[in-house]
Design a protein with these regions (language model features):
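Conserved short submotifs of the Hanks-type protein kinase catalytic core
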Residues: 89-104, 108
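AlphaC helix of the eukaryotic protein kinase fold
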Residues: 55-72
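A short, aromatic-enriched beta-strand patch in the conserved N-lobe beta-sheet
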Residues: 83-85
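Activation segment signature within eukaryotic-like protein kinase domains
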Residues: 124-125
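Protein kinase glycine-rich loop
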Residues: 20-27, 31
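Conserved beta3-strand ATP-binding lysine motif
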Residues: 46-51
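Conserved N-lobe loop of protein kinases adjacent to the ATP-binding glycine-rich P-loop
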Residues: 35-43
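Protein kinase catalytic-loop region centered on the HRD/HxD motif
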Residues: 130-140
Length: 143
């Protein structure tokens, strides 16, 4: 048995099934949908893999900082981070996040605006502001 303060290393690899290999992408990587076959749950995985190779090492510490900050957040209007996988020797990694079922925000807004449901737009706006107020109350500035 390990003593308090000693590092505990888990040997089992965690495997996921790729459900959607192209949920989204940006200048610092892409997002995919994975399924944990053991608990039968979907997750979004954000892979840190900058488009430019020179950026990989330069922004890796920012990626790790994002993990630390986001993992502390717990609010109904902020996507939850459940786990992370950091590969420091390769300057890459993954953030495993809550998967929210539904259409993309732009598609949803287009549908709501087309229907003229301005009450729903107001409701969505209130939820957005509520989430940002929580983030700001935690001393975090969203960019």
């Amino acid at each position: 048995m390990k003593e308090n303060g000693e590092l505990v290393h888990f040997f089992r690899d965690k495997n996921y099934i790729m459900v959607n290999n192209d949920l989204g992408s940006g200048s610092f990587g892409k997002t995919v949908v994975l399924q944990d076959p053991f608990i039968d749950e979907l997750f979004v995985a954000k892979k840190y893999e900058p488009y430019y190779e020179d950026d990989r090492k330069a922004f890796y510490d920012s990626f790790l900082q994002e993990i630390k900050i986001m993992h502390k957040l717990n609010h109904q209007n902020v996507v939850r981070i459940y786990n992370y996988y950091a590969y420091e020797d390769q300057y890459t990694g993954y953030i495993l996040m809550e998967y929210i079922i539904g259409e993309s925000l732009p598609d949803y807004l287009e549908t709501v605006c087309t229907l003229g449901d301005y009450g729903e737009i107001d409701n969505l706006f209130v939820q957005l502001i509520d989430g940002f107020q929580y983030i700001e109350s935690q001393g975090i500035v969203h960019r």
